[in-house]
Structures are given as C-alpha cells and as structure tokens.
A protein has these predicted regions:
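Non-catalytic cap/lid and distal C-terminal segments of serine-dependent acyl enzymes
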Residues: 1-332
Length: 332
C-alpha cells in the first residue's frame, strides 16, 4: 500500500477451496520474464519458472500455526475454506502410534543409497496386513508426517491394520530420473528392497491388496508400475499424476503412457485404480481427464476424484487417506 510498509493482495475463491501459500517479499520489477505476459493469457511455463526462482526466498505466514516445508524445501502455510472436504485423520495429530523404523537401501542396480521408512498400524495378524508403498517418502515421513493420520483412521476402522513403506527420492534430479516410467527403479525395488523388507516384517503379499501410491511424477510412476507388474502391484493411488510426461509444454493431450494406452497397452490382470487431480492445475487436470476413460475401458475398477485445489500436498494428504480406504474396502 503506497506510503506504508504494508503489502496487500486479494482474490476470490470458491468456498470448497483448499490450498497452501507462502509470502515472498520482493521489490524487483523483473521477477518474471516479459514473455510471461505477452499473450492474452499468462504463459504458464514462463510463470512457473519465475515462481521457482523466487521460492528460495519464501517464508511461512508468521500468524498461521499450520506450516510445513514444501517438496522443494520452502515454507508453506495452510488455508482451508469453510466448505473444503473433510480430511479425517489429519485432525488428530497427537494420535499415539508405534515406532517408525528407518533403514538404508543401498541399491546395486540403481547405484545409489537412500532412506526407507517402515511403519505398521497393527501386528495382531501380520500375514493379513496389506502393503502400501508411498513414493516421495521423505515428504510423508518428515515434512508432513503421515503416521498419526494413518493410525487414527486405522483406530476408527476406516483403514485396516497395514504395513506402509515410504521410499526417499534422494534429490530432485534422482526423482526426475527414477520416477517417470523407469523400469530399472521398479525392478530394483522388487529384486532388492522387497526381499530385504521380508526379513524385517510380514504382510499379505497378494497383489489385490498391494498399493503403490504417489503424487505428480509419483502418480505416473505408480500407474506405470501396476500396468507393467500387475502380479506384484494390484492397486494404484495416483494423485496429480504427470501423464503429460515427457513433454510438459507441447503435449497437453497426453504423454508416453497415455499414448501407449491408446495404442493398445493391455494389463495382464485387472487393477484397482484411484485417480485424483486438482481443477486448479490445468495441464495435470487435462491429462487425467484424458487417461481416465482409457483406464475405464480396460480395468476392473477405476475411481476418479476432482479436487478444488492445485498441485498441492495440502490437498493430497486427504486424498491419500481416502484413496487407501477406497482401494482396500473391496479387497479385504
């Protein structure tokens, strides 16, 4: 506001909106390239690059008690509008739960080393517990810990007692290489990580109850894994799946996996698939709209949920719990 040290901005949102935000103080007039505003509509790719350069200077809202570190390490704060869908489990952050085991996976095939977290929500009948593999595990283990929400929904009878395996991505470069349709990553997981996990805990190894879950590249990776190894992974939880890959800017109608489905890619076994995308993430929303009917043509059970939000972990956390409940409800 002129003549003061107060910054002011306003917008209008629907009452069902949920999203995260941060403050990025700047007095620079050239934070975004000129081409971002040359057309009638802002150029989203140019805007994206401008925001990414600004994020290291972001701060959380100092008056908002609900804050965390986003996927790129910058502070975020939460905003839930009055009619945003409930997120059961996340409202009980103090729910007691058992200890989380953290191990190191030293992969010969991938030639790297990373953390893996193992968490169980019950041990009365270990061989009957389903398994869920969560990609971007470092986020759900450290930035926005998922343990209390999983335990709270298990205690409430919404989720069965289960084993959760959270896999670190190491860094953004490794993530961008390993998660998008990378057979080497999934072969290493099956040949190296799962055999080691069997020496540490037990679960029901039927594919009908084994979930692979991920967001963005992780959502793409989850569906890729199940389509190619259905004998191991029978349930998919894909949130904001990056089905544009590998051509973000030039192929809004779909990337490699969509093209393969259109070309007749058939899975040997029927899968259970839970898709979710935000209506405020245009490209992601478009490609999820495109892949949904393709999966309906070939798969046993596909559920598609559209969220009034963007490419945002604050939205994903609710869908993660809802997706697990839906996938396991008819399988157990």
């Amino acid at each position: 506001m002129p003549g003061t040290d107060v910054w002011q901005w306003q917008t209008r949102l629907g009452s069902t909106w949920r999203g995260s935000y941060c403050f990025i103080p700047s007095v620079c007039e050239e934070d975004f390239p000129a081409q971002a505003f040359e057309g009638i509509e802002p150029a989203r790719m140019a805007l994206r690059e401008g925001w990414r350069k600004l994020l290291p200077r972001a701060i959380a809202d100092p008056l908002n008690p609900e804050s965390w570190l986003g996927g790129r390490g910058h502070p975020m704060s939460a905003l839930h509008l009055p009619d945003a869908p409930p997120q059961p489990g996340w409202d009980k952050p103090n729910t007691p739960h058992c200890a989380v085991q953290c191990i190191t996976w030293d992969s010969l095939r991938l030639k790297n080393q990373r953390k893996v977290w193992i968490f169980a929500t019950g041990d009365a009948q270990p061989e009957e517990r389903p398994l869920a593999i969560l990609l971007d595990g470092q986020f759900w283990a450290e930035s926005m810990p998922v343990w209390p929400a999983l335990q709270a929904q298990t205690d409430a009878g919404v989720l069965p007692p289960a084993v959760y395996v959270l896999i670190d991505v190491i860094d953004n470069n490794t993530r961008s290489n390993e998660l998008p349709c990378n057979a080497q990553f999934w072969q290493a997981l099956q040949e190296e990580l799962l055999p080691h996990l069997r020496t540490l805990t037990r679960w029901n190894e039927t594919p009908e109850t084994t979930v692979v879950a991920g967001q963005s590249f992780g959502g793409l990776s989850s569906l890729y894994a199940a389509l190619h190894w259905p004998e191991q992974f029978g349930c998919v939880l894909s949130q904001s799946g990056s089905y544009w890959w590998p051509n973000r800017g030039s192929n809004p109608q779909g990337g490699q996996l969509i093209q393969r489905l259109e070309g007749g890619l058939v899975c040997d076994k029927p899968l259970r698939i839970y898709l979710e995308a935000g209506v405020r993430e245009p490209l992601i929303h478009q490609v999820n709209q495109r892949i949904y009917p393709l999966l309906q043509q070939t798969q046993r059970a596909v559920f598609y949920r559209q969220v009034d939000g963007g490419h945002d972990a604050l939205c994903w956390r609710g869908g993660l719990i809802n997706g697990l409940a839906w996938l396991w409800k008819a399988s157990l």
